[in-house]
A protein has these predicted regions:
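N-terminal type II signal-anchor transmembrane helix
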Residues: 2-37
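Long, hydrophobic/aromatic-enriched structural stretches that serve as scaffold segments
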Residues: 92-123
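The canonical Cys-X-X-Cys-His
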Residues: 57, 63-72, 105, 139
Length: 160
């Protein structure tokens, strides 16, 4: 009986060590992928900012869910507050916040890549990767039409 208990204990210990090892390798690979710097080609967007383009951009922001994360005024908001697991804060897209140009905007929306070339952890870029240049330009025109707004927001962080 003692031998059986010892074998079960060693088996469980082995499983725990293997699980910790697999999780450690997965975490390490994820962090390495998120630290990768991407270089993207610039895209020439026709951003006229005329009322029709801005209205199209407003429509896209509402129907594609931009307002769900960035807020109705696009000034950012806390999207997920999971305590010790982490907190996700959507960026302020108005001139008071991100203040990005059309290329940085396109890189973020379609590719999920920030100004520094690193992945934006929670940007659902796969949802927008197929968006046409005209739609990205309209969305950018809408963002640029929003008045500057700011609010105190915590930093995004991901726990263990």
């Amino acid at each position: 009986m003692k031998r059986l208990v010892r074998l079960v204990a060693y088996g469980l210990l082995t499983l725990v060590v293997l699980a910790v090892g697999v999780l450690g390798v997965a975490w390490w690979r994820m962090e390495a992928a998120l630290d990768r710097v991407y270089t993207l080609a610039d895209v020439k967007l026709d951003v006229s900012g005329d009322p029709a383009q801005v209205e199209r951009g407003r429509h896209l922001a509402v129907t594609r869910g931009c307002n769900d994360c960035h807020g109705d005024d696009l000034a950012g908001r806390v999207v997920i507050d999971a305590g010790p697991i982490g907190i996700y804060v959507a960026a302020n897209l108005t001139a008071a916040g991100a203040g990005m140009d059309a290329n940085h905007f396109e890189h973020a929306v379609r590719h999920g890549v920030g100004r520094d070339g690193r992945p934006l952890r929670f940007m659902p870029a796969t949802d927008f990767a197929g968006m046409g240049d005209d739609d990205v330009a309209a969305l950018f025109a809408f963002v640029k039409s929003m008045p500057p707004a700011s609010r105190a927001l915590p930093e995004t962080w991901i726990g263990p």
